[in-house]
Amino acid sequence: CFRRSCYITKPTLSRLEMGPIWDFDLAFGNMYMDNPKYDDWATIGSMDSSSYIGVTWFNYLMTDEDFRNKARTRWNDVRNTMVNAALGTIDAYKPMVIPSAEENFEIWNTLGVANGFQPLTMKNYNTYLDQVLYLRKFINNRAKWIDENL
């Protein structure tokens, strides 16, 4: 989200604000060029701009110990709420989305296929429920990795 679909605003006489988060098309391991793994900082490219992500302001923020300490504190404050909300949202919407997902996959024949910039591992998920399980596992693994690496 720090390369695209992320905005910073500056209200008059106020601090910088992040948001709104725009979309999640590149989130949760869905784009191989942004590093589909849960165990890395996908927003940090090579400092010589040779990577797809390139040099961004986030590269520099993550080298600032004060920023990392504040980020760690904030993560610890919101982690469980965020993870539970994400997993709860998936569970809540899954029954409602299943009919549309089945129709979508029938029309577009995209199950078991890595489309566009998706990682090749998407070929392993041959049902909608497989993809839901992938998403849930990714979220849990990502949260655990952040716990250990922030």
Stretch-by-stretch model annotation:
Residues 1-150:
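Middle-to-C-terminal accessory/interaction subdomains
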